[in-house]
């Protein structure tokens, strides 16, 4: 299977092995994760089996939504509207986002970090994504699928490969810190 096939598989329902392969591609072939995480891949047992699916309707074009998610200045406005930085210790700039496949991003003052696995302008964003509270080397895969719906954009969002027990907090965070501020910013 080529690297391109691995990336395509990641975007459409990844298995644990595909997640690890895709993240390794995104990070230039580095071995990621703890020894336990690497053992999971070898023994085929997933300890990060949970996933999240959410949909949000944003009253804006796909281009405006894509730009808000991939442009540093736009995403800084999302962060400001979320209010989350008020409750966090100062950690530097709100966000820094590369707009290239393989490029890094740092969000919410460094609390969220990762790399872009796939960028299809105005259609799809796939990222290797992590919070600062996770064990070193643990990344989830997030996918934002942007679908035109009437005069707005439906974001079909999926996240897989995160630590067990994190689903509830992550799901609430996506709503409070992404979908609601995006709606405020773009309408």
Language model region names:
Residues 1-14:
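N-terminal secretory signal peptides
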């Amino acid at each position: 299977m080529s690297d391109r096939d691995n990336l395509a598989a990641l975007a459409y329902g990844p298995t644990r092995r595909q997640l690890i392969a895709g993240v390794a591609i995104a990070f230039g072939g580095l071995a990621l994760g703890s020894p336990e995480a690497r053992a999971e891949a070898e023994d085929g047992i997933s300890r990060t089996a949970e996933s999240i699916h959410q949909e949000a309707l944003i009253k804006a074009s796909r281009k405006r939504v894509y730009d808000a998610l991939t442009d540093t200045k736009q995403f800084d406005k999302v962060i400001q509207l979320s209010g989350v930085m008020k409750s966090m210790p100062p950690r530097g700039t709100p966000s820094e986002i590369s707009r290239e496949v393989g490029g890094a991003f740092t969000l919410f003052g460094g609390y969220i970090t990762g790399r872009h696995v796939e960028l299809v302008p105005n259609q799809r964003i796939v990222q290797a994504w992590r919070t600062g509270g996770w064990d070193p080397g643990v990344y989830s895969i997030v996918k934002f699928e942007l679908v035109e719906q009437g005069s707005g954009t439906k974001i079909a969002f999926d996240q897989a490969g995160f630590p067990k027990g994190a689903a509830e907090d992550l799901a609430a965070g996506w709503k409070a810190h992404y979908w609601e501020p995006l709606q405020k910013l773009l309408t």
